[in-house]
């Protein structure tokens, strides 16, 4: 069927979102047409605001609307431990657990040779710079996802960090292999943190 151009553009825009196929995009586009104009305008403003106002923390790489982020700014956090995660959604998942009181470092990805992603393509160099600048850090917890890419990233980082003398641990595999941190419940994450091991 031929849609009006404005609807076609809206459908095409929705299909660019992860997990949204053509049929879902059509449903969403027609839902937008049924919404009140004020709600559509608020939705559009929220999208633009999120894109414009959210940036990355200059210390840890987490998403934030102020620099440094709320975690790096919190003086009550344990500044001797840094938990390395793949993306900002993992920070949110860890924070829901409420057991971990250290700092974070967000890689913004994982090593994946099949996709042409190497260590230089993720936030590794800033981690090394951070470790050289902050002598208070005594432990790095590698909390990358328990899949092939996450394991490859953890092994790479453990080998890279060993010469520094900083303790390097890996979260335990209370998480399902092939799963993502952001989908784990608080109890599973808590057990995984308690069962972390030396690498």
Curated annotation (Swiss-Prot):
User: What residue stretches are annotated with the Toprim domain?
Assistant: 80-176
Task: Identify the InterPro entries for this entry.
Answer: DNA_Rcmb_RecR, Rcmb_RecR, Rcmb_RecR_Znf, TOPRIM_dom, TOPRIM_RecR
Please name the GO terms of the biological process aspect recorded for this protein, alphabetically.
Answer: DNA recombination; DNA repair
Zn finger (C4-type) start-end: 57-72
User: Which residues are listed as membrane-spanning?
Assistant: none
Q: Which UniProt keywords apply?
A: DNA damage, DNA recombination, DNA repair, Metal-binding, Zinc, Zinc-finger
One Pfam assignment: RecR_HhH
Question: What SUPFAM superfamilies does the record tag this protein with?
Answer: Recombination protein RecR
Q: Quick check: keyword Metal-binding in the entry?
A: yes
Give the matching CDD domains. TOPRIM_recR
**Could you tell me which Gene3D superfamilies the record lists for this protein?**
3.30.60.80, 3.40.1360.10, 6.10.250.240, RecR Domain 1
Named from the GO MF annotations, one term is: DNA binding
Q: Which NCBIfam families match?
A: recR
Write out the function statement from the record: May play a role in DNA repair. It seems to be involved in an RecBC-independent recombinational process of DNA repair. It may act with RecF and RecO.
- Homology family: Belongs to the RecR family.
Q: What protein name applies here?
A: Recombination protein RecR
Q: What is the lineage of its organism?
A: Bacteria, Bacillati, Bacillota, Bacilli, Bacillales
């Amino acid at each position: 069927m031929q849609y009006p151009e404005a609807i076609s553009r809206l459908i095409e825009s929705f299909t660019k979102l992860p997990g949204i196929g053509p049929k879902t995009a059509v449903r969403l586009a027609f839902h937008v047409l049924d919404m009140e104009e004020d709600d559509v305008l608020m939705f559009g403003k929220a999208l633009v605001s999120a894109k414009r106002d959210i940036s990355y923390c200059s210390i840890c790489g987490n998403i934030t609307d102020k620099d440094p982020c709320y975690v790096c700014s919190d003086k009550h956090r344990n500044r001797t431990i840094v938990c390395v995660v793949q993306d900002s959604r993992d920070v949110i998942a860890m924070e829901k657990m409420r057991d971990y009181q250290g700092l974070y470092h967000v890689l913004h990805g994982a090593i994946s040779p099949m996709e042409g992603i190497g260590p230089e393509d993720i936030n590794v160099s800033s981690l090394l710079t951070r470790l050289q600048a902050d002598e208070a850090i005594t432990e790095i917890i590698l909390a990358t996802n328990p899949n092939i890419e996450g394991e490859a990233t953890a092994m790479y980082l453990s080998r890279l960090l060993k010469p520094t003398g900083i303790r390097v641990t890996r979260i335990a595999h209370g998480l399902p292999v092939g799963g993502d941190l952001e989908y784990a419940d608080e109890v599973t994450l808590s057990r995984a943190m308690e069962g972390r091991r030396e690498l």
